[in-house]
Amino acid sequence: MPLIHINIMMAFIMSLVGLLMYRSHLMSALLCLEGMMLSLFILTALLALDSHFILASMIPIILLVFAACEAAIGLALLVMISSTYGTDYVQNLNLLRC
């Protein structure tokens, strides 16, 4: 396995550990999720280039679309929580009612 693949996997694992450690604030959780999605995007793009399979080149683009949707929903929740409660604690997510 090339060294770049190991580095990207380590970046994913570090983002996952950061998500598990700093889960009290929503902004920290969103940043860790974005780090995970970025490392997954780079890893799938590298694997698609290595495989020389035509349909494999669509997977990173689909992953990027899901990452953009996740970021938009996360930022909308962050704005809603911040304007309602004044803080970005994840425990306030249980208090939101539609």
UniProtKB/Swiss-Prot annotation:
Protein encoded by which gene: MT-ND4L
Keyword vocabulary terms for this entry: Electron transport, Membrane, Mitochondrion, Mitochondrion inner membrane, NAD, Respiratory chain, Translocase, Transmembrane, Transmembrane helix, Transport, Ubiquinone
A GO BP entry: ATP synthesis coupled electron transport
Membrane-spanning segments: 1-21, 29-49, 61-81
MF GO annotations: NADH dehydrogenase (ubiquinone) activity
Entry's EC annotation: 7.1.1.2
Signal peptide as annotated in the record: none
Keyword Transport in record: yes
Quaternary structure annotation from Swiss-Prot or TrEMBL: Core subunit of respiratory chain NADH dehydrogenase (Complex I) which is composed of 45 different subunits.
Job description of the protein: Core subunit of the mitochondrial membrane respiratory chain NADH dehydrogenase (Complex I) which catalyzes electron transfer from NADH through the respiratory chain, using ubiquinone as an electron acceptor. Part of the enzyme membrane arm which is embedded in the lipid bilayer and involved in proton translocation.
Membrane topology: Multi-pass membrane protein
Organism: Kogia breviceps (Pygmy sperm whale)
Catalyzed reactions: a ubiquinone + NADH + 5 H(+)(in) = a ubiquinol + NAD(+) + 4 H(+)(out)
Family: Belongs to the complex I subunit 4L family.
Protein name per UniProt: NADH-ubiquinone oxidoreductase chain 4L
Compartments it resides in: Mitochondrion inner membrane
GO cellular component terms, A-Z: mitochondrial inner membrane; respiratory chain complex I
